[in-house]
Regions:
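Class I S-adenosyl-L-methionine
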Residues: 14-26, 30-62, 72, 78-235
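Extreme N-terminal starter segment of soluble prokaryotic enzymes
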Residues: 1-4
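Nucleic-acid-processing active sites and adjacent nucleic-acid-binding tracks
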Residues: 63-67
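Conserved SAM/SAH-binding loop
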Residues: 6-11
Length: 235
């Protein structure tokens, strides 16, 4: 079952007892101004050699990323979940001692961040996964193999559509669930954003409880999820 609400995450979490969720997979505020992305054009070279000028998504500027998530949030998150995967660990002034997951976005030749780092309470090692995620340049598969990760999705119409400035790909969440969650685990996401995790949980049949405070993002994510669910039903 997927349960998603339009509310503050602290209000959601306070309704649950200690250790209710087996795994929280969250992407809180980093405090780096990601709510006001620049609107610069990109160039995309097709597999047939054609170069396209691609406009960046015209995201509405908002005010949710002026400061990173605080200790009150992390204390509550750790109370309600047995284990956590927390993106943006390098931005937080909070003791998150444990493993790390590094997502290599294969952005070496761009001005975008080369990778993103997550805290992983399930172990103390560092795991690296590679998936191309740079505008129109999206990977065909998510893998630890650097050579395979460089293969692009050739048909750009199959690319994942962006609806949120910090959107993470569905394939990344599927990889996290396959590698770190167990069958029957209850999953928590306190910052739904684009809803990618909801699609991944739907595909892999995990129960998800999630919330999104921003009404615009909430509505867009719910529409995205409903369309995906209808398409899966049809095919």
């Amino acid at each position: 079952m997927i349960q998603i609400s339009n509310e503050d995450n602290m209000e959601l979490m306070k309704r649950y007892p200690d250790n209710y969720f087996e795994l929280a997979i969250v992407d809180p505020e980093y405090g780096i101004g990601a709510d006001k992305p620049s609107r610069k054009p990109n160039k995309c070279k097709q597999s047939n050699g054609t170069v396209l000028n691609v406009k960046s998504p015209n995201y509405t500027h908002k005010n949710w990323d002026s400061k990173p998530a605080d200790s009150r949030y992390f204390d509550e998150l750790k109370r309600v979940s047995k284990n956590q995967i927390i993106w943006g660990v390098n931005y937080y002034d909070y003791n998150l001692t444990g493993g790390r997951i590094i997502w290599d976005k294969l952005n070496d030749s761009s001005d975008q961040f080369d990778c993103e780092i997550a805290y992983n309470s399930l172990n103390k090692r560092t795991d690296i996964v590679r998936y191309m995620w740079r505008g129109m340049f999206q990977g065909l598969s998510i893998t630890k193999n650097a050579h395979k990760a460089l293969i692009q999705q050739g048909n750009k119409s199959k690319n994942e559509k962006r609806i949120h400035p910090t959107q993470k790909p569905v394939k990344l969440y599927e990889w996290l669930l396959i590698n770190y969650a167990k069958e029957g685990d209850k999953i928590l996401d306190t910052h739904l954003g684009s809803g990618s995790i909801a699609i991944a949980c739907h595909n892999l049949k995990f129960d998800l409880t999630a919330c999104e405070l921003d009404k615009d993002y909430f509505d867009a994510a719910m529409l995205r999820l409903r369309i995906h669910q209808m398409q899966k039903t049809l095919f």
